[in-house]
Amino acid sequence: ARDGYIVHDGTNCKYSCEFGSEYKYCGPLCEKKKAKTGYCYLFACWCIEVPDEVRVWGEDGFMCWS
């Protein structure tokens, strides 16, 4: 497991979020992806302890594509 920005399935696009909604939105979203938890960091959802089988941003480059 590792920490990172989760991406939308089939894309390399991060989940955007608003500052101030740190845990309300990203926490449950990260948990759905089987991570321990997560929060909003630099306007995207950063997840803690993401399982190795779940892709995170940067593994397939840094451009958003769909």
From Swiss-Prot:
It holds the Pfam family Toxin_3. Coiled coil: none annotated. The keyword Aminoacyl-tRNA synthetase does not apply. Residues 2-65 form the LCN-type CS-alpha/beta domain. InterPro entries: LCN-type_CS_alpha_beta_dom (IPR044062), Scorpion_toxin-like (IPR003614), Scorpion_toxin-like_sf (IPR036574), Scorpion_toxinL (IPR018218), Scorpion_toxinL/defensin (IPR002061). GO terms for molecular function: sodium channel inhibitor activity; toxin activity. Disulfide bonds join 13-64, 17-40, 26-45, 30-47. GO terms for cellular component: extracellular region. Keywords: Disulfide bond, Secreted. It is found in: Secreted. GO terms for biological process: defense response. Gene3D superfamilies: Knottin, scorpion toxin-like. Expressed by the venom gland. Its main location: secreted. The keyword Secreted applies. It comes from the Eukaryota. Has the structural arrangement of an alpha-helix connected to antiparallel beta-sheets by disulfide bonds (CS-alpha/beta). This protein is not toxic. Belongs to the long (4 C-C) scorpion toxin superfamily. Sodium channel inhibitor family. Beta subfamily. This is Neurotoxin-like protein STR1. The lineage of its organism: Eukaryota, Metazoa, Ecdysozoa, Arthropoda, Chelicerata.
